[in-house]
């Protein structure tokens, strides 16, 4: 069928099942957007290119599908670099389609030219520069395959402007042939037999859940394994929701701001079953001492992650969609016996969990983060998707907000990108229109992409935005308070910005809570809004996130929290 390159892109997106595009137009993609217009293809005009790429990211995380975004050349696609890196660090499947200057202008420092392929090489799974229209169908087919297969990740397709204009006989390939890359990994079953044998020999096992369980959609299979073995569970930030937070022996998040029970379980276990996690430094603390008493079994699809940071005694390298069903099958005959074998250990870790709840305090004239999270939780459905920005509120959400389903907790874990949350929540809502979507943000993070408030209003996207307002960059402020002699350099925001007024000006119904006694009534009104809504809630400006493992310390060298910042058993339970 004869068509131009721009039309070929739209037809290819349809064949790949793409439902919506996030983007921002410009000179090199005008022909592409003209085809979007003629086709009436669903697209969202964001307020900034970073909003577009984070929107595609949130869509991908919530749905499990490939997110797609468009940008023009030069500053347009350069504005997406942070979002591409965010997706790369968290293994999120994206296809980023950017315009490039015309082929005869490439390499001449032309107007709005940037070598985006070179810029993004370290932060994409693969990228392409398309200078021949006949290559476009193959490249797009490969891009979607690479993005979603194996360990997912972002793929950039940079297309010269004249390629969009050129006409050719379009035919979309049915298969992908990439030499040396299959995208499907089945490991050695003998490694699984070793893992089962280690479980049989263990008396004090712990399961560490990572984001790989979420991205592979194997949470239900893993839940079956957990229920059979009745094994204590700890989670990474990215793995939150893979096992319901309400599971009896779920000890919470591990690592820098993990629970005492989770961190002490890792320190005291004799077997660590780590599934779909890459042992990030925020999880391990001092990696040389991480789970030092334990035999470590590491399940991961990416061979590069095996033994990269933490040495594993048994490594099961392969797709979790292959390995976890086999594991479930292999423990069927021994699971009940093993559950009994682990009974004393379960009791021990549960007692620690009860004795050392996450720290929280009630301060006059302010709403505590714990109270806010719990009151929000009461008002939303179990199926609600929670997004966060980055900072203290992110950790409080991980500690105090119970998530019971996979793909229902969206956060920037690897890169820690402030400004991620609002556009990601927008993308999640568009991908999952039947679900409630709630964003937790801080008064620092929300400013970074607040222009997307207008996008919510323009498209009537009913995200509910909860901003914890303390007038400071909370996590930076906390570190300065604890480790830099209270030198609050460049971390105090002040009280001049009225973000409720900003939201109102952008067409979003806004609320504010300055008196803690008003919280419940205002939250009721907030959640009753039909459409997007914004609420900012005053929290203590000097509140710290505890527990905390200082950088470079061992997991059992936690500051648990208290009025004097010393170890204490006071506080309020996380769950």
Q: Model regions: which residues?
A:
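Hydrophobic, well-ordered secondary-structure elements that form the walls
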Residues: 296, 376, 388, 427, ...
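Phosphate/pyrophosphate-binding active-site segments
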Residues: 134, 293-390, 516, 523, ...
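Secondary-structure transition/capping motifs at alpha-helix termini
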Residues: 39, 228, 382-383, 403-407, ...
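Glycine-rich phosphate/pyrophosphate-binding beta-alpha loops
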Residues: 26-29, 74, 91, 154, ...
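N-terminal alpha/beta PP-like core and its mobile active-site loop of ThDP/TPP-dependent enzymes
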Residues: 1-340, 355, 375, 379-382, ...
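Active-site diphosphate/adenylate-binding microenvironment
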Residues: 6-9, 14, 32-34, 347-428
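Catalytic phosphate/nucleotide-handling subdomain of diverse soluble enzymes
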Residues: 420-464, 468
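Thiamine diphosphate
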Residues: 112, 268, 458-551
């Amino acid at each position: 069928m004869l068509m131009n390159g721009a039309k070929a892109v739209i037809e290819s997106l349809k064949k790949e099942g793409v439902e919506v595009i996030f983007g921002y137009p410009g000179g090199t993609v005008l022909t592409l957007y003209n085809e979007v217009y003629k086709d009436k293809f669903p697209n969202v005009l964001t307020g900034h290119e970073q909003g577009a790429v984070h929107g595609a990211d949130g869509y991908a995380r919530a749905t499990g599908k490939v997110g797609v975004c468009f940008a023009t050349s030069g500053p347009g696609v350069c504005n997406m670099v942070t979002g591409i890196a965010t997706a790369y660090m968290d293994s999120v499947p994206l296809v980023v389609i950017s315009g490039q200057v015309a082929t005869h202008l490439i390499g001449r420092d032309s107007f709005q030219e940037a070598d985006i392929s070179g810029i993004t090489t370290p932060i994409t799974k693969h990228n392409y520069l398309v200078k021949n229209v006949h290559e476009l169908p193959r490249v797009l087919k490969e891009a979607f395959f690479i993005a979603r297969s194996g360990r997912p990740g972002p793929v950039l397709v940079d297309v010269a402007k004249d390629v969009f204009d050129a006409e050719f006989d379009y035919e979309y390939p049915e298969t992908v042939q990439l030499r040396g890359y299959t995208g499907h990994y089945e490991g050695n079953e003998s490694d699984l037999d070793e893992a089962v044998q280690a479980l049989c020999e263990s008396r004090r096992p712990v399961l560490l859940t990572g984001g790989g369980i979420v991205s592979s959609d194997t949470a239900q299979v893993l839940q079956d394994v957990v229920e059979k073995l009745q094994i204590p569970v700890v989670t990474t930030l990215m793995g939150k929701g893979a096992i319901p937070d309400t599971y009896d022996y779920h000890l919470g998040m591990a690592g820098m701001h993990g629970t005492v029970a989770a961190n002490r379980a890792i320190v005291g276990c004799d077997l660590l079953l780590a599934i779909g996690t890459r042992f990030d430094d925020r999880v391990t603390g001092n990696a040389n001492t991480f789970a030092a008493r334990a035999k470590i079994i590491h399940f991961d699809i990416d061979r590069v992650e095996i033994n990269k940071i933490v040495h594993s005694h048994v490594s099961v390298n392969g797709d979790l969609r292959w390995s976890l069903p086999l594991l479930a099958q292999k423990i069927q005959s021994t699971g009940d016996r093993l559950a009994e074998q682990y009974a004393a250990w379960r009791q021990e870790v549960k007692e620690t969990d009860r004795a050392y709840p996450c720290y929280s305090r009630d301060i006059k004239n302010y709403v505590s983060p714990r109270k806010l999270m719990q009151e929000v939780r009461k008002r939303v459905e179990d199926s609600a998707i929670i997004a966060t920005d980055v900072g203290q509120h992110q950790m409080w959400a991980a500690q105090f907000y119970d998530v019971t389903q996979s793909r229902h907790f969206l956060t920037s874990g690897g890169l820690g990108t402030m400004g991620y949350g609002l556009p990601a929540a927008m993308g999640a809502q568009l991908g999952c229109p039947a679900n409630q979507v709630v964003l937790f943000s801080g008064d620092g993070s929300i400013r970074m992409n607040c222009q997307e408030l207008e996008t919510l209003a323009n498209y009537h996207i009913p995200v509910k935005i909860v901003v914890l307002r303390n007038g400071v960059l909370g996590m930076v402020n906390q570190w300065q308070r604890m480790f830099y002699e209270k030198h609050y350099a460049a971390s105090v925001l002040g009280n001049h910005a009225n973000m409720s007024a900003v939201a109102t000006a952008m067409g979003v119904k806004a609320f504010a809570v300055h008196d803690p006694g008003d919280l419940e009534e205002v939250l009721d009104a907030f959640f009753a809004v039909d459409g997007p809504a914004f609420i900012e809630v005053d929290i203590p400006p000097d509140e710290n996130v505890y527990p905390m493992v200082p950088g470079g310390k061992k997991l059992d060298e936690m500051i648990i929290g208290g009025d004097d910042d010393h170890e204490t058993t006071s506080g309020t339970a996380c769950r």
